Amino acid sequence: MKTKTESKKCAPKATAKKVAVKKSANVLLERTDKVVTKDKNSVLKIFGPTYKVSAILNEAMNEARAAETGLPVAKVLEVLKLRDHWCIRREWIEGKTLAETMAGDKKNLMRYLKEFVAIQCEIFSKTSERMGNLADKLDKQISASALPKETRYDLHMRLQSMPRGKALCHGDFNPTNVIITPSGDWRVIDWSHVRLGDPLADVARTYLLFWLSGHVAAAEKYMALACEALKVKIADVQKWLPIVAAAESSKEQSVKNHELLLHWASVVDYE
């Protein structure tokens, strides 16, 4: 593996203020400038002031478009404004995430990973005429990254040479976003990053998500299974890794993850 000159070390962007919620709220997830709570039989995603209204509406629209493909997703019920915060209300899905299931039954990791890959391939089999392309999003994120100008240029050129694709790509496909219902059915949630693109780019991002969460062994097993299912070589996915890592580094990350992503983004070739 060859790397370019070490990129300058840059700390992640400053964090935005957290969204304030009632003490009685059933908080499911808390991230920078957004909170997800359970509200009776629905899930409420509450956005902070840094989110543009157009981006929130677009997220809801993309989730509706994903549902129109026939995939089992959490349906968007409404977009509303509560206490000066824009929100998206979705249906509540009973069950456990695949991440919880895997953590509680580690001896069957390979079986769960195979199911995980099968679900992702089912998503790849869908498309939509009214959805943005992943390559365009990656291009903008590379421009916004903290990488040196020369490295960003190289990545832009590499991205232009990669296939754009028209497959539905979840954009944040990881075991925490797959829910297994009591009946054994699966539902995929959090479609805020969905785009059309090359499936291998989405596989590369999922691989990085395993890495960033500390599940390195699972990342390698996932990569092998995904490549086998898609009938491609691991090297084909690895071509996307620097591009996807650079794009991911443009978001807020812990210092450790940020530096890891900058390293991946500096990779020029795989041997």
Predicted regions and their residues:
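ATP-binding glycine-rich loop module of kinase domains
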Residues: N26, E30-I56, A64
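Active-site acidic catalytic loop and adjacent metal/ATP-binding pocket
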Residues: V35-K38, M157-A201
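Structural motif at the C-terminus of the N-lobe alphaC helix and the adjacent alphaC-beta4 loop
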Residues: M61-P72
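Short beta-strand micro-motifs within the conserved protein kinase catalytic domain, predominantly
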Residues: K75-W86
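Conserved short submotifs of the Hanks-type protein kinase catalytic core
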Residues: D84-T97
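Internal "kinase-insert"/substrate-recognition segments embedded within catalytic cores
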Residues: K106-D136
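An alpha-helical support segment within catalytic cores of ATP-dependent transferases
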Residues: S125-G171, T181-P182, S266-V268
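Helix-rich C-terminal or lid/interface subdomains of diverse kinases
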Residues: R205-E271
